[in-house]
């Protein structure tokens, strides 16, 4: 008799995607982050829905509604901190997922990679809007600085900013539309994630060696489901530890001060996961140039498949490329550190050098290293 998972139309889809899915036999723990991202997304939607039931998207009551959630709502404090720290965990998993894609050459699965970039942009947009909602000092000034960047667009910039604001300054209409978009975007992210998986299952997963595994596959369940559950337990342990022992470790103290348009904080900065892009923005003295560099720092990921010059897909057997990959990680960590600091010397110069090195490493050094490695292969 045919098992129900193979005959029922709905269960059949789940079976093909998560149970009988043929998978390479040598996937490492780096392949866990896709399922962890799904877990983080589900957690964010559940906690977000619970918070939305008590939140008031109006400048006069937004800050107090957050205080009300934290103090008066049953388990409101843990819901709020799970949501805030869950976003940090989501971005950690996201960056590691992208890093794995770069290291093992998964970007050569073009459709999957490009939808992944769209997911990254959408997640960053959602997170930025979520940062504005508590209506603290950093929420208000962060929103002012970031939305003002659009005024650098020639001709339509000023009108575009006023259209986003819903007036001549950030006020209740801005907060209402940000809340609406912050609520709806995660559901669009789920739809895009489904398309991401659809394209991935069309080609099959890449593997650490970067070679075809068509001749040797294993079932996804129970091997990789067990592995994913272990990753999920570790993720939940880290999230629970962070939320229960140090919930404000990754938050900004200025956001516990109600938004005041007449009082600018000494150092305006976004959440930690945007700091690398924020440093690149700050490194260029020209406003339009800074905005272009900011967008290019993310969109450069779309150019990586075109910059792949190696005869091998994975970096596993390419020491020069490995060195440049870890150099790139060091540059990104440096950019994150500089973004969290005020604009003073010598930090500004370090930020400018790191920003320049970020683009040079990806656009010039990595393709060059691949060509050198191709020539070295001829001598072996």
From Swiss-Prot:
Keywords: Electron transport, Heme, Iron, Membrane, Metal-binding, Mitochondrion, Mitochondrion inner membrane, Respiratory chain, Transmembrane, Transmembrane helix, Transport, Ubiquinone
GO cellular component term of the entry, any: mitochondrial inner membrane
Residues the record lists as binding heme b b566: 97, 196
Transmembrane region(s): 33-53, 77-98, 113-133, 178-198, 226-246, 288-308, 320-340, 347-367
List of residues binding heme b b562: 83, 182
Superkingdom of source: Eukaryota
Anything else known: Heme 1 (or BL or b562) is low-potential and absorbs at about 562 nm, and heme 2 (or BH or b566) is high-potential and absorbs at about 566 nm.
Cofactor note: Binds 2 heme b groups non-covalently.
Family: Belongs to the cytochrome b family.
Subcellular locations according to the entry: Mitochondrion inner membrane
GO terms, biological process: mitochondrial electron transport, ubiquinol to cytochrome c
UniProt xrefs under PROSITE patterns: CYTB_CTER, CYTB_NTER
SS bond partners: none
Principal place of residence: mitochondrion
Name used for this protein in its record: Cytochrome b
InterPro entries in the record: Cyt_b/b6_C (IPR005798), Cyt_b/b6_C_sf (IPR036150), Cyt_b/b6_N (IPR005797), Cytb/b6-like_sf (IPR027387), Cytochrome_b (IPR030689), Cytochrome_b_C_euk/bac (IPR048260), Cytochrome_b_N_euk/bac (IPR048259), Di-haem_cyt_TM (IPR016174)
Cofactor(s) required for function per UniProt: heme b
Gene: MT-CYB
Membrane topology: Multi-pass membrane protein
An example Gene Ontology molecular-function term: metal ion binding
Subunit structure of this chain's protein: The cytochrome bc1 complex contains 11 subunits: 3 respiratory subunits (MT-CYB, CYC1 and UQCRFS1), 2 core proteins (UQCRC1 and UQCRC2) and 6 low-molecular weight proteins (UQCRH/QCR6, UQCRB/QCR7, UQCRQ/QCR8, UQCR10/QCR9, UQCR11/QCR10 and a cleavage product of UQCRFS1). This cytochrome bc1 complex then forms a dimer.
Any one Pfam family match given in the protein's UniProt record, by short name: Cytochrom_B_C
Function of the protein: Component of the ubiquinol-cytochrome c reductase complex (complex III or cytochrome b-c1 complex) that is part of the mitochondrial respiratory chain. The b-c1 complex mediates electron transfer from ubiquinol to cytochrome c. Contributes to the generation of a proton gradient across the mitochondrial membrane that is then used for ATP synthesis.
Binding site residues for a ubiquinone: 201
The keyword Repeat appears for this protein: no
């Amino acid at each position: 008799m045919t098992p129900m998972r193979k005959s029922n139309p709905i269960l059949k889809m789940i079976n093909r995607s998560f149970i009988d899915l043929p998978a390479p036999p040598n996937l490492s723990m780096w392949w866990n982050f896709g399922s962890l991202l799904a877990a983080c997304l589900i957690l964010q939607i559940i906690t977000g829905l619970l918070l939305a039931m008590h939140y008031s998207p109006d400048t006069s009551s937004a800050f107090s509604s957050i205080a009300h959630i934290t103090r008066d709502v049953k388990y409101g404090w843990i819901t709020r901190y799970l949501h805030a720290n869950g976003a940090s965990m989501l971005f950690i998993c996201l960056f590691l997922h992208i890093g794995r894609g770069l290291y093992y050459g998964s970007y050569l699965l073009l459709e999957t990679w490009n939808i992944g970039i769209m997911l990254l942009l959408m997640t960053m947009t959602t997170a930025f809007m979520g940062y504005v909602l508590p209506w603290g000092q950093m929420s208000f000034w962060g929103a002012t600085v970031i939305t003002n960047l659009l005024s650098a667009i020639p001709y339509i910039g000023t009108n575009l900013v006023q259209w986003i604001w819903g007036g001549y300054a950030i006020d209740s209409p801005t907060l209402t539309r940000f809340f609406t978009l912050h609520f709806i975007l995660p559901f669009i992210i789920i739809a895009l994630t489904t398309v991401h998986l659809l394209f991935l299952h069309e080609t099959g997963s890449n593997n650490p060696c970067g070679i075809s595994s068509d001749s040797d596959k294993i079932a996804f369940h129970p091997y990789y489901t067990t592995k994913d559950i272990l990753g999920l337990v570790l993720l939940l342990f880290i999230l629970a530890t962070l939320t229960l022992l140090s919930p404000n470790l990754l938050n900004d103290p200025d956001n516990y001060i109600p938004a005041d348009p007449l009082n600018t904080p000494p150092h305006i900065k976004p959440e930690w996961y945007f700091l690398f892009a924020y440093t690149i923005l700050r490194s260029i003295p020209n406003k339009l140039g800074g905005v272009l560099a900011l967008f290019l720092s993310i969109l450069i990921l779309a150019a990586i498949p075109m910059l792949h010059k190696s005869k091998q897909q994975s970096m596993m057997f390419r020491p020069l490329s490995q060195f440049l990959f870890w150099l790139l990680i060091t540059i990104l960590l440096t950019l994150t550190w500089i973004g969290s600091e005020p604009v003073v010397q010598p930090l500004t110069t370090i930020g400018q050098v790191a920003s320049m090195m970020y683009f040079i490493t990806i656009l010039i050094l990595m393709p060059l290293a691949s060509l050198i490695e191709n020539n070295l292969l001829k001598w072996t």
